[in-house]
UniProtKB/Swiss-Prot annotation:
Name of this chain's protein: RNA 3'-terminal phosphate cyclase
UniProt KW keywords: ATP-binding, Cytoplasm, Ligase, Nucleotide-binding
InterPro entries: RNA3'-term_phos_cycl_insert, RNA3'_phos_cyclase_dom, RNA3'_phos_cyclase_dom_sf, RNA3'_term_phos_cyc, RNA3'_term_phos_cyc_type_1, RNA3'P_cycl/enolpyr_Trfase_a/b, RPTC_insert
Family: Belongs to the RNA 3'-terminal cyclase family. Type 1 subfamily.
Species whose genome carries this gene: Pyrobaculum neutrophilum (strain DSM 2338 / JCM 9278 / NBRC 100436 / V24Sta)
Keyword Protease annotated: no
Enzyme class: ligase
Length: 347
């Protein structure tokens, strides 16, 4: 019997699809998703969603119905988890990070190590930048006992893409719960400021503005400057992260765009990171919505905190609860929200 998911629930976007496909694939449960992106101006599946679906189908030898542009219904029936090396081309500047979000949980339950070579957009709007996935997402998952490495080969920006990343993961066995409501003391604050096919001073100005904004708040940051000329088009951005003495890692990011001063990009990333540090949360808003799936799969009770109960977070909790016999608690506690669940200890 397929799990039936209403794709218009809550946030009503691609996140529902990504989480549903990931859980269907790794649990071996068929899923039917209806009303996909029904509330959006361009409803139904878009090319970058289709890449995630086809990649998940490749990794699970799945039977798929409705995988076409504009389709508002998708049926996905996985067979067996596969492993090895796979090449995935999103085409244009579809987000590599969003495809990684879909596939990472599947890789952790594959029968042997897996390598994905993914081409597309590394730093694009409405998605976590690739440096966030490398330095926050992948590192946070080690707390659950997962081993996943993301290597940046080449950056790709909107509209032409052409970026490349390599993802390598090992089977995790059973994930362990993480109980860490307090961020702890910042042990290291670092970042990457990049500019591609732009004057090198763009990356330098972004980095300086980020460092100065954090310094005013009492935080010393080391921000690497990366100026490259190997992209298909221009683009820039900043990702900052803070690691704590108890093993937490949180991030803040901003993307450059035409007409937006480099200093504004740096300050925006710094302000996002500072807001999480000020609240003492163990998760930033990006990571909070991505982590609930791993909390539910882990063995034991996980308790983490974040600064916002975003619609993405609430929607992901709803999706996970449709697939697994878990019940999340999401409660306000001062400047933070506490996310708590007793995981199932899969498999």
């Amino acid at each position: 019997m397929a799990v039936r998911i209403d794709g218009s629930y809550g946030e009503g976007g691609g996140q529902i699809l990504r989480t549903s496909i990931a859980l269907s694939a790794l649990l071996g449960k068929p899923v039917e998703i209806v009303n996909i992106r029904a509330k959006r101006a361009n409803p139904g599946l878009q090319p970058q969603h289709l890449t995630g679906v086809s990649a998940a189908a490749l990794l699970t030898d799945a039977e798929v119905e409705g995988a076409a542009k504009g389709s508002t219904r998708l049926f996905f029936k996985p067979k067996a988890l596969k492993c090895g090396t796979f090449n995935i081309d999103i085409g244009t500047a579809g987000s590599i990070s969003l495809v990684v979000q879909t596939l990472a949980p599947i890789l952790l339950y594959a029968p042997c190590p897996t390598k994905l070579v993914i081409t597309g957009g590394t730093d694009v709007a409405w998605a976590p930048p690739i440096d966030y996935m490398r330095f926050v997402f992948a590192r946070y998952l080690t707390r659950f006992g997962a081993r996943i490495a993301i290597e940046l080969v080449k950056r790709g920006h909107y509209p032409r893409g052409g970026g490349k990343a390599v993802v390598q993961a090992e089977p995790a066995g059973r994930l362990r719960a993480v109980d860490s409501v307090e961020f702890g003391r910042p042990a290291k604050i670092a970042g990457v400021s990049h500019a591609v096919n732009l004057p090198p001073h763009v990356a330098e100005r972004q980095a300086r503005a980020a460092r100065e904004a954090l310094a005013k708040l009492g935080y010393a940051a080391e921000v690497e400057v990366e100026a490259r000329n190997d992209g298909l088009g221009p683009g820039s951005g900043v990702v900052l992260w803070a690691e704590s003495d108890v093993g937490n890692v949180v991030g803040g990011d901003a993307l450059g765009e035409r007409g937006k001063p480099a200093e504004e990009v740096g300050r925006e990333a710094a302000e996002k990171l500072a807001a999480v540090l000020k609240a003492g949360a163990s998760l930033d808003p990006h990571m909070a919505d991505m982590v609930v799936l791993y909390m539910a799969l882990a063995q034991g009770r996980s308790r983490l905190s974040t600064t916002e109960a975003t619609m993405h977070l609430q929607t992901n909790i709803y999706i996970v609860e449709q697939f697994l016999p878990v019940k999340f608690k999401l409660e306000r506690a001062g400047p933070r929200y506490i996310i708590e669940v007793e995981g199932v200890g899969y498999p």
